[in-house]
Design a protein with these regions (language model features):
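Catalytic Cys-His active-site segments of thiol-dependent hydrolases/isopeptidases
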Residues: 156-164
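Serine endopeptidase catalytic core focused on the charge-relay Asp
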Residues: 1-139, 147-150, 163, 175-182, ...
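C-terminal helix/juxtamembrane-tail motif
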Residues: 183-198
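A short, polar/charged loop-to-alpha-helix boundary motif
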Residues: 168-176
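Active-site signature of cysteine proteases
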Residues: 151, 166-169
């Protein structure tokens, strides 16, 4: 089992470990070197820039302390559902995250597909909900999973992973599709990655 962390956090680890904290426990996770390295992924004829995601292995003795369930907007542990929506179908979708600081952060997807031509990457832009009393996220929340309650009340969809705030547009934040992040980890490590099922 692995923990997913922001690469921009992982690269600052002096001993290739990160601490994973919740209300009841602290676990140290050993970062997988290939997911932290500052390099592009080489495909057959192209070079693909990397997304802001790294992985750390959980010690088997610590796995029982991990709660792998996703939380609904109300904070209830819930069944994880795969997000099968195309990018454009995510427009105006109400989302939430449970980060290190924001518990919860509430937002909305406002731009479901932004292409960064300089780096050949695609992002999803999310922002604070109108009339919300709190912001979607705060410093320290990067790496949080951006989720949406399933339209039919049967679980939580994991959509993307939070990178951080858009410094040029207050109240807006950049994320990337989590399936793209998992694909990157697979290419970097020649291993299989998937989100935990509860």
């Amino acid at each position: 089992m692995c923990a997913l962390v922001s690469r921009h956090v992982a690269i600052h680890s002096k001993d290739m470990h990160v601490s994973l904290l919740d209300q009841n426990s602290s676990i140290r996770s050993k970062l997988i070197q290939e997911t932290v390295a500052n390099k592009c992924i080489k495909n057959t004829d192209t070079v693909v820039p990397i997304l802001d995601i790294s992985a750390g292995e959980i010690n088997p003795a610590d796995i029982s302390m991990c709660d792998t369930r996703f939380k609904s907007e109300c904070g209830n542990p819930s069944t994880r559902k795969d997000c099968t929506y195309e990018d454009k179908q995510l427009d105006n979708r109400r989302i939430h995250l449970w980060g290190a600081v924001s518990k919860p952060g509430l937002g909305i997807i406002t731009i479901p597909e932004v292409r960064d031509r300089n780096h050949d990457k695609t992002y999803i832009i999310v922002e604070n909900r109108a009339n919300a009393t709190a912001v979607l996220c705060r410093e320290g929340d990067s790496g949080a999973m951006v989720c949406a309650d399933d339209d039919y009340g049967s679980g939580v969809e994991a959509i993307s992973m939070l990178i951080g705030k858009d410094t040029t547009n207050p109240g807006k934040y950049a994320t990337f599709r989590i399936d793209k992040g998992l694909q990157q980890l697979e290419k970097q490590t020649d291993s299989s990655f998937s989100l935990c099922q509860d």
